[in-house]
A protein has these predicted regions:
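Short proline/glycine- and basic residue-enriched helix-capping loop/turn segments at helix->loop/beta transitions
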Residues: 1-19
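Cyclic-nucleotide recognition modules
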Residues: 10, 56-114, 118
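Short amphipathic alpha-helical elements of helix-turn-helix/winged-helix folds
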Residues: 139-143
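Phosphate-/nucleic-acid-contacting segments
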Residues: 145-200
């Protein structure tokens, strides 16, 4: 995450989005860098039948939609606020100027993009598996290892809804629910007050 004060020095402003507000749409030009102060954003696509495919969820402290800024391409997905959100927005040219003058921040962006590429490559291979339980568990374990899920005496809290797990693994919600219950019986997951925990 780039420090808020530094972004503001280069002209970043705060913008507020309500739940379900569209931040940008697929196949539109990329003019800004976005970094979330509070709230949550999802990036998605829809196929010809109208089925939604989730590219990812982004939370406070995270940025999204950067790749087209560097290759002068159109956005490959939509960005939509999933809850009321406050987002720092800075024009592309000012953002690039910041990166040129602050190499540590540039390296941070590169590492962030590399992390996402690794995630997509890993999950693409796992989603090829036909076993729903395997898909769900791999998503959870990857998130534990790379996204700093919170941990308490019950294990790691899985900070995804059943719908989000389904969207990220290509499974129907009903299939996710059955898989989670089966994994609970196998003592690989815990369900406490409707929250899912990964056993440690």
């Amino acid at each position: 995450m780039i420090q808020k004060e530094l972004l503001e020095q280069y002209g970043a402003i705060e913008k507020r989005y309500g739940k379900s507000d569209v931040i940008f749409e697929v196949n539109t030009n990329a003019h800004y860098y976005y970094q979330i102060i509070s709230g949550e954003v999802k990036m998605n696509n829809y196929n010809e039948e109208g089925k939604e495919f989730i590219q990812g969820f982004f939370k406070a402290g995270e940025s999204f939609g950067e790749p087209p800024l560097f290759v002068n391409r159109l956005y490959p997905a939509n960005a939509i606020a999933t809850e009321d959100s406050v987002i720092l927005v800075i024009k592309k040219d000012f953002f690039k100027e910041l990166l040129l003058e602050h190499p540590k921040e540039a390296l941070s962006i590169i590492e962030n993009l590399a992390q996402r590429l690794h995630y997509k490559a890993t999950m693409a291979a796992e989603i090829a598996s036909e076993d729903p339980e395997h898909r769900v568990l791999q998503l959870i374990d990857y998130s534990i290892n790379h996204f700093n899920l919170s941990k308490d005496e019950n294990g790691y809290l899985v900070d995804f809804t059943r719908q989000q797990i389904g969207d990220l693994t290509g499974l129907r919600v009903e299939t996710v629910i059955r898989a989670v219950k089966s994994l609970e019986k196998k003592r690989m997951l815990k369900i406490i007050n409707r929250k899912v925990y990964r056993e440690v």
